[in-house]
């Protein structure tokens, strides 16, 4: 009996133990990352040929403790390698693990290689060559602290390489992972299996090979034992011939009941080719189809729906996936009553969009991603969610977040008509109207931006996430916007300058119209879009006040107020902001509106420091500072409540005799220190109600705005 070790992906060890035991393995023992077992020659070859879950099968040669690279070299060079293979073979060393002495796997692999070739030279033999591409012999070294295990890799290439997959779509599953998903899905051999988003077909091919009794390595041409001196050719031929006979025997017994659907006809061609290579093309029916129109191909039977849908690593990039999972859940409940469903995803949040309760779930890794597989039982009663294809859109809306959907629909009717009259492309459609749906929905021309407000700490995180998913689904249905034109953002309470935090780097800009001004927006790269919609009337008012005046825009952001002032006939404009990014944005806004000339200055500076040194006067000043800032580029922190009087003192110095300051901020509960202002010789009138547009009338505290002049 040989002592062997089968490696597998983390989480599949128990499943692998069962599989190996069924194949005849003795004394199977689970450890992290694999299973130790004993086997005679026939069982060894049977596990190599038939295991669908093992990544590699290793034959340990050296097990020892090492405390330096010299110990490593000594252990390897002192081993009798001629008993395993001769000098004419090529070899390669896979080295895994590090410790304090051997800190790099490449260094460890080099020392093992040195030990092997030096051993052969000491025996008077030719140095065996290293082959990184297709070596005759593969040596596997594993180091954990001081514990070293060096094994002969009897697999050769990793066992997930079945040989049938010539090509794949994006993010393909490893075949070993696909086999595990099938085994855990609840699918019963002989029953229908449907993959509605099949990609290159790996799940269906693995399942079909299980039913057809096709050994997963039946088509493998090269093995790690081909040049092994202990290789038992007669035992190997017996095991392989048994597998060939069994596969031929089963071919005539199986009727086609595997179905693969995908929207991409190109990837379906790859799936068909892969199935042909895997010997199961006659068992699987392929069809180009959208999951939104998914039909049950076996209405009078009960089977399993299995799939690995697309998934994103960040929720904020996946509105299209939210819609996909939502409609998938609806089709399952309409078309597959009484069926089992098994879905594998890295984002359990997306699985919540199915709106189904899982009966079982399993954790797994897909490369670096933590994933989950959830099994469901579809109710035997046909869902009323979709009763007629013509009513698909309406019923989707009414099933998912109906209260939110109805409110959004009502707001759209009211606000869209008003926005058209005002010649506005960008406006708010929903602003946390319903407490349970704590988010904002904005339209920017053909795009929709959904901004989630951070949920209070007393709200269950999973419940808040589910409501967000439902709201996104309903928004897509009500607005009819294309999924790639819905942008989802998670917004938290502003801390310092996190409105400047970069979220992406797409660089996708387009302009919107606002009272005759054209303004660039970017919906994806930053927390904000480049245009504060609640200040629309403030900007319009500035345009009306600016004619013939010298205008200062302090804390200017993207300079949209400057554009309105210039279009309103300002004699000059000065735009100051600390961010070079936003100042460049402001410049592009000016160019877009044909605003040019030396009278329009753009200044990158700490606004407070610049103001203290400014020696000219302005007739109209717009200042919209952050609520709080502790930017490293500022010498001191800023708090609008604490510091606004000092700001007004400096602004008074640069304000012309008949000039006006328009001062705004977003601090809720802000209290203007009117007494201190009067002592400065300034008077302030609150005009917040006049600057609140129709689409923000429910949120009266979104900003406060003041008009300040000399007494």
UniProtKB/Swiss-Prot annotation:
Gene3D superfamilies (UniProt xref): 3.30.2130.30, RNA methyltransferase domain (HRMD) like (3.30.750.80), Vaccinia Virus protein VP39 (3.40.50.150)
Keywords: Cytoplasm, Methyltransferase, RNA-binding, rRNA processing, S-adenosyl-L-methionine, Transferase
THUMP domain sequence ranges: 43-154
GO cellular component: a single term: cytoplasm
GO molecular function, one term: RNA binding
Compartment(s): Cytoplasm
Reactions it catalyzes: guanosine(2445) in 23S rRNA + S-adenosyl-L-methionine = N(2)-methylguanosine(2445) in 23S rRNA + S-adenosyl-L-homocysteine + H(+); guanosine(2069) in 23S rRNA + S-adenosyl-L-methionine = N(2)-methylguanosine(2069) in 23S rRNA + S-adenosyl-L-homocysteine + H(+)
Enzyme class: transferase
One of the Pfam families matching this protein, by short name: UPF0020
Enzyme Commission identifier(s): 2.1.1.173, 2.1.1.264
Job of this protein: Specifically methylates the guanine in position 2445 (m2G2445) and the guanine in position 2069 (m7G2069) of 23S rRNA.
Cited PANTHER family: RIBOSOMAL RNA LARGE SUBUNIT METHYLTRANSFERASE K/L, RIBOSOMAL RNA LARGE SUBUNIT METHYLTRANSFERASE K_L
Similarity annotation: Belongs to the methyltransferase superfamily. RlmKL family.
UniProt-listed HAMAP family: 23SrRNA_methyltr_KL
Protein name: Ribosomal RNA large subunit methyltransferase K/L
Source organism of this protein record: Haemophilus influenzae (strain PittEE)
Origin organism lineage: Bacteria, Pseudomonadati, Pseudomonadota, Gammaproteobacteria, Pasteurellales
């Amino acid at each position: 009996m040989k002592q062997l070790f089968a490696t597998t992906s983390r989480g599949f060890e128990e499943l692998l133990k069962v599989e190996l035991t069924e194949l005849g393995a003795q004394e199977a023992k689970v450890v992290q990352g694999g299973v130790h077992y004993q086997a005679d020659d026939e069982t060894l070859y049977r596990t190599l040929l038939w295991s669908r879950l093992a990544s590699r099968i290793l034959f340990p040669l050296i097990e020892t403790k090492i405390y330096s690279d010299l110990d490593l070299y000594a252990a390897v060079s002192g081993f009798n390698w001629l008993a395993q293979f001769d000098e004419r073979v090529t070899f390669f060393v896979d080295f895994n693990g590090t410790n304090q002495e051997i800190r790099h796997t490449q260094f460890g692999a080099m020392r093992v290689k040195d030990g092997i070739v030096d051993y052969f030279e000491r025996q008077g033999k030719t140095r065996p060559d290293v082959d990184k591409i297709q070596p005759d012999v593969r040596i596997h070294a594993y180091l954990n602290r001081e514990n070293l295990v060096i094994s002969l890799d009897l697999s050769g290439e990793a066992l997930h390489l079945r040989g049938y997959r010539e090509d794949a779509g994006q993010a393909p599953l490893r075949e070993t992972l696909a086999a595990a998903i099938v085994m855990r899905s609840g699918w019963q051999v002989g029953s229908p299996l449907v993959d509605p988003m099949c990609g290159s077909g790996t799940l269906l091919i693995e399942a079909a090979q299980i039913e057809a009794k096709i050994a997963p390595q039946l088509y493998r041409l090269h093995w790690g034992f081909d040049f092994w001196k202990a290789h038992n050719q007669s035992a190997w031929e017996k095991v392989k011939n048994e597998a060939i006979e069994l596969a031929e025997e089963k071919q005539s017994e199986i009727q086609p009941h595997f179905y693969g659907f995908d929207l991409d006809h190109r990837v379906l061609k790859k799936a068909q080719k892969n199935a042909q290579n895997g010997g199961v093309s006659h068992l699987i029916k392929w069809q180009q189809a959208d999951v939104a129109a998914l039909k049950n191909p076996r209405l009078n039977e009960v089977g399993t729906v299995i799939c690995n849908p697309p998934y994103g690593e960040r929720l904020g990039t996946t509105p299209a996936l939210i819609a996909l999972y939502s409609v998938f859940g609806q089709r399952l409940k309409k078309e597959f009553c009484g069926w089992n469903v098994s879905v594998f995803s890295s984002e359990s949040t997306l699985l919540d969009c199915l709106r189904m309760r899982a009966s079982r779930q399993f954790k797994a890794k897909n490369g670096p991603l933590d994933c989950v597989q959830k099994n469901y039982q579809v109710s035997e009663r046909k869902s009323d969610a979709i009763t007629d294809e013509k009513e698909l859109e309406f019923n989707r809306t009414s099933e998912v977040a109906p209260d939110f959907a109805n409110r959004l629909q009502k707001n759209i009717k009211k606000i869209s008509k008003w926005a058209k009259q005002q010649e506005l492309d960008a406006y708010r459609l929903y602003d946390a109207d319903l407490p349970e749906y704590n988010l904002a929905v904005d339209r920017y021309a053909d795009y929709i931006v959904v901004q989630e407000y951070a949920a209070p700490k007393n709200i269950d995180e999973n419940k808040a996430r589910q409501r967000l998913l439902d709201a996104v689904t309903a928004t897509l249905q009500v607005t009819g916007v294309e999924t790639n034109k819905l942008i989802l953002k998670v917004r938290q309470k502003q801390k310092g300058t996190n409105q400047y935090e970069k979220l992406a780097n797409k660089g996708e800009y387009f302009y919107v119209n606002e009272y005759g001004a054209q303004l660039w927006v970017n919906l994806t790269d930053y927390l904000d879009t480049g245009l504060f919609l609640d200040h629309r009337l403030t900007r319009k008012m500035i345009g009306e006040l600016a004619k013939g005046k010298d205008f200062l825009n302090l804390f200017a952001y993207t300079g949209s107020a400057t554009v309105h002032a210039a279009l309103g006939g300002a004699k000059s404009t000065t735009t100051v902001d600390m961010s070079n990014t936003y100042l460049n944005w402001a410049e592009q806004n000016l160019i877009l509106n044909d605003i040019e000339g030396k009278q329009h200055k753009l200044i990158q500076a700490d606004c407070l420091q610049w103001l203290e040194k400014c020696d000219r006067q302005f007739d109209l000043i717009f200042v919209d500072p952050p609520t709080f800032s502790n930017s490293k580029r500022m010498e001191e922190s800023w708090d609008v409540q604490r510091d606004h009087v000092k700001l007004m003192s400096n602004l008074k110095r640069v304000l012309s005799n008949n000039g006006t300051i328009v001062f705004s901020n977003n601090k809720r509960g802000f209290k203007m220190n009117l007494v201190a202002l009067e002592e400065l010789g300034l008077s302030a009138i609150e005009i917040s109600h006049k600057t609140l547009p129709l689409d923000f009338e429910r949120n009266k505290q979104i900003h406060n705005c003041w008009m300040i002049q000399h007494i």
